[in-house]
Curated annotation (Swiss-Prot):
Co-factor requirement: pyridoxal 5'-phosphate
Binding site for substrate: R21, S137, K156, T363
Gene: hemA
This protein's name: 5-aminolevulinate synthase 1
N6-(pyridoxal phosphate)lysine: modified positions: K248
GO biological process, any: protoporphyrinogen IX biosynthetic process
InterPro entries per the UniProt record, alphabetical: 4pyrrol_synth_NH2levulA_synth (IPR010961), Aminotrans_II_pyridoxalP_BS (IPR001917), Aminotransferase_I/II_large (IPR004839), AON_synthase_class-II (IPR050087), PyrdxlP-dep_Trfase (IPR015424), PyrdxlP-dep_Trfase_major (IPR015421), PyrdxlP-dep_Trfase_small (IPR015422)
Subunit structure and binding partners: Homodimer.
UniProt source species: Cereibacter sphaeroides (strain ATCC 17023 / DSM 158 / JCM 6121 / CCUG 31486 / LMG 2827 / NBRC 12203 / NCIMB 8253 / ATH 2.4.1.) (Rhodobacter sphaeroides)
Keyword line: Acyltransferase, Heme biosynthesis, Pyridoxal phosphate, Transferase
Amino acid sequence: MDYNLALDTALNRLHTEGRYRTFIDIERRKGAFPKAMWRKPDGSEKEITVWCGNDYLGMGQHPVVLGAMHEALDSTGAGSGGTRNISGTTLYHKRLEAELADLHGKEAALVFSSAYIANDATLSTLPQLIPGLVIVSDKLNHASMIEGIRRSGTEKHIFKHNDLDDLRRILTSIGKDRPILVAFESVYSMDGDFGRIEEICDIADEFGALKYIDEVHAVGMYGPRGGGVAERDGLMDRIDIINGTLGKAYGVFGGYIAASSKMCDAVRSYAPGFIFSTSLPPVVAAGAAASVRHLKGDVELREKHQTQARILKMRLKGLGLPIIDHGSHIVPVHVGDPVHCKMISDMLLEHFGIYVQPINFPTVPRGTERLRFTPSPVHDSGMIDHLVKAMDVLWQHCALNRAEVVA
């Protein structure tokens, strides 16, 4: 068996289809976000503006967060020293979980090494805890949810994205006598559309189903205290399990679930992804807790974030660019093929100092390739002007279609 030949075949297929992924070597600079330094393959450096990061609010640079991390580092050192069960639970972890439980109005929270692991571990474990559990999942749920459900081996059904009639049809076919969990998201990251939380809860409640929501692209950014779209809409108490991240709006690292004390205790006790993973370093837990605590009160930062997203959408729409606008902070621009998508991304970086990663299959379906911009409160008007002008030039250069602009 020629193993290298098999690997070459797989990699060459990606190159041929124009969707081979390259890593851009960048260095974030303290206090300069969204500016960063790009180290080119030849070793030279160029200052760029990051337009595709997940540090949605710039909290990864916030003095409150950095101060908490410096204090914890000086106090405890680098790593946690173990799993949560064996010497790896510290005061910092307990404080963070208390902040998260309070954020979502739940009895408890459980911190994982990432939101991916939190989804995967929880969804793969629940069918072991609840015999006969059937999971009903939105078609566009994140890969971590899909993988967790797959690994559980339980009976599963997929309903059409945000389609309430299809959800009801599936639940009716399962019946009211079986345990059911309905899994969905609040903000779907590739299109930026919102999950139909209230209506899904209404239908799920008719069948006595548990509700599991992924708020990864919403926590910190929506709701009076940053509890997500469910908080914004006054629906947190109707959700049984909330999944979130500490690596996007909160600007640090890690993931979690928030739920009842009994639910968190059961997952803590049975999920291999929690039990056998080294816990977050105390310095990370301290920074995350400080960020969560700060954003509970920083309404102005959230409002500015939404304002910048609206401005960017309006400016790009004014050029006739095909924006996918569902009202969230995510700004996808539809390109429609992987070659042009990567070409525009490369030219933005090389010629304009603008970094946005192309989004290609399998992250999105073929023919829906896009550039996905994530404006933040610290992307100022000059940066927006520069981006809009660059997109205008490159869209014309690539002879891509524009929509008619109504005056």
